[in-house]
UniProtKB/Swiss-Prot annotation:
Binds 1 divalent metal cation per subunit that could be manganese. GO terms for biological process: amino acid biosynthetic process; aromatic amino acid family biosynthetic process; chorismate biosynthetic process; green leaf volatile biosynthetic process. Residues 47-56 have a biased composition (Polar residues). The gene is DAHP1. GO terms for cellular component: chloroplast. Residues 47-70 are annotated as: Disordered. Induction: Triggered by EOBI in flowers. Residues 1-57 form a transit peptide. It catalyses: D-erythrose 4-phosphate + phosphoenolpyruvate + H2O = 7-phospho-2-dehydro-3-deoxy-D-arabino-heptonate + phosphate. NCBIfam families: DAHP_synth_II. Mn(2+) binds at C145, H429, E471, D501. This is Phospho-2-dehydro-3-deoxyheptonate aldolase 1, chloroplastic.
Length: 533
């Protein structure tokens, strides 16, 4: 049943009481010897093949991490974990709710709600990310900087999904490998802030932390953290994912349709000639497949796999949606398939790392030029002590010049520790500037330069560029300057709709996909020529 933001919350409550289940020990994640609260085990769907539920591990024993890494990480990984053990650690970036009793009641209500995603889907994503770590797949992760209640409608969801489909088709053809499509959608509300308060004209109010916490209007009522927003965020996330599932499996994602969209883009792009050749080759490939008997109405050509992700920031909410999976005996945060820890909350002894080390979802780590290589090795050891491929994705956000200087040291440290990770470029956050009009923006040329640096470094180091992570939208906004359909500083205010950071619009996103696809193609052809020598 599709969820609606207009539904009453009582209609979402389960009809039967939750049943306490024994907590199962497992080899790969921390366990707890006592039940903290009643947990209803969630059986994984999409996992009828039991072999698909087997965690991927490295094919041969990895090299032991450096002694300093082992000593620092072992103390954390040996500690008993429970779904609320994070409360014993220092938690940064959490809002202060004035009404704690109301917060407690809201969290209890969400605990009783159904999961938004399923454990089997998260396991399947981990397998796919393991392929990306080995250079056999490519991650495309994109969506809003921060989802909002005001802009929640089917058209916006459809447009972002559509552009991700178009980008995925281009990247898949360029790299001749599967593209893992993950949306920053269906839960990407909360945002970390550098300051707890914002001051305007002598008035000081709490900072806006995302629509699931407070409102962006600068008044006391809007800025006061409201627990009821968590329930609305849950309902919007569930409704968004419901629509995404329908789009992914109902024919909207048909490859022939996506290819025609890309051909239309090249016809109307100022640099269309540059991209038309690739788009035409995709169209010809579909014609060949049709002639060979793999018709375009085959299920593999009309459906796609799609996963959701968001930053793991609001720990009380994440805990409320954590469930014990009856298939594996592992805990999964069922708010999203993939969660990442941000630059501001990745402290080794912090609450966010403590929570994430105990859930079985695939995890991301945002890494800037401030990250020390040895600290990264320690963090990976805490979050992935069994060295499972696909468990950890490193999302680098540095700016082009810092990327060339800092990334090689991180790659060498991780490789030296024998750790398996998927390397991904976030070319957005390291390239934010302030326009003359005062609005934040990101130059497309700087974004492109960071992606180029990412590929250059991996080529230099002999490692695998595993994907890109983008803040983007399917709407025709004017938030990032540049691109073939040039957006100038003067254009910014005309369609500047973001609630937080500037996003690539549909045209800029697809243009970047064509650029990356060409780089993937050159890398593939280079590898083939080396093998042919």
């Amino acid at each position: 049943m599709a969820l609606s933001t207009n539904s009453t919350t009582s209609s979402l409550l389960p009809k039967t009481p939750l049943v306490q289940q024994p907590l199962l020990k497992n080899a790969s994640l921390p366990t707890t010897t006592k039940a903290i609260r009643f947990i209803q085990p969630i059986s994984a769907i999409h996992s009828s093949d039991s072999s698909k539920n087997t965690p991927i591990v490295s094919a041969k024993p990895s090299s032991p991490p450096a002694a300093t890494s082992t000593a620092a990480a072992t103390a954390v990984t040996k500690q008993e974990w429970s779904i609320d053990s994070w409360k014993t650690k220092k938690a940064l970036q959490l809002p202060e709710y004035p009404n704690q009793e109301e917060l407690k009641n809201v969290l209890k209500t969400i605990e009783d709600f159904p999961p938004i995603v399923f454990a089997g889907e998260a396991r399947h994503l981990e397998e796919k990310l393991g392929e990306a770590a080995m250079g056999r797949a490519f991650l495309l992760q994109g969506g809003d900087c921060a989802e909002s209640f005001k802009e929640f409608n089917a058209n916006n969801i459809r447009d972002t999904f559509r552009i991700l489909l178009q980008m995925g088709a281009v990247l898949m053809f360029g790299g001749q490998m599967p593209v893992i499509k993950v949306g920053r959608m269906a839960g990407q509300f909360a945002k970390p802030r550098s300051d707890n308060f914002e001051e305007k004209n002598g008035v000081k109010l709490p900072s806006y932390r995302g629509d699931n916490v407070n409102g962006d209007a600068f008044d006391l009522k809007s800025r006061t953290p409201d627990p009821q927003r968590l329930i609305r965020a849950y309902c919007q996330s569930a409704a968004t994912l419901n629509l995404l599932r329908a789009f992914a499996t109902g024919g909207y994602a048909a490859m022939q349709r996506v290819t025609q969209w890309n051909l239309d883009f090249t016809e109307h792009s100022e640099q269309g000639d540059r991209y038309r050749e690739l788009a035409n080759r995709v169209d010809e490939a579909l014609g060949f497949m049709n002639a060979a008997g793999l018709t375009t109405d085959h299920p593999i050509m009309t459906t796609t796999e799609f996963w959701t992700s968001h930053e793991c920031l609001l720990l009380p909410y994440e805990q409320s949606l954590t469930r014990l999976d009856s298939t594996s005996g592992l805990y999964y945060d069922c708010s999203a398939h993939f969660l990442w820890v941000g630059e501001r909350t990745r402290q080794l002894d912090g609450a966010h790392v403590e929570f994430l080390r105990g859930i079985a979802n695939p995890l991301g780590i945002k890494v800037s030029d401030k990250m020390d290589p040895s600290a990264l090795v320690k963090l990976i050891e805490i979050l992935n002590p069994q060295n499972k491929a696909g468990r950890i994705t490193i999302i680098t956000r540095m700016g082009a010049e810092n990327m060339r200087v800092k990334l090689p040291h991180l790659i060498r440290a991780v490789r030296g520790a024998g750790q398996i990770v998927t390397w991904v470029s976030d070319p957005m956050h390291g390239n934010t500037i302030k326009a003359p009009c005062g609005l934040k923006t990101r130059p497309f040329d700087s974004i492109r330069a960071e992606v180029r640096a990412f590929f250059d470094v991996h080529e230099q180091e002999g490692s695998h560029p595993g994907g890109v992570h983008l803040e983007m939208t399917g709407q025709n906004v004017t938030e990032c300057i540049g691109g073939s359909r040039t957006v100038t500083f003067d254009d910014l205010s005309s369609r500047y709709h973001t609630h937080c950071d500037p996003r690539l619009n549909a045209s800029q996103s697809l243009e970047l996909a064509f650029i990356i696809a060409e780089r993937l193609r050159k890398r593939r052809l280079g590898s083939q020529s080396v093998l042919g020598q």
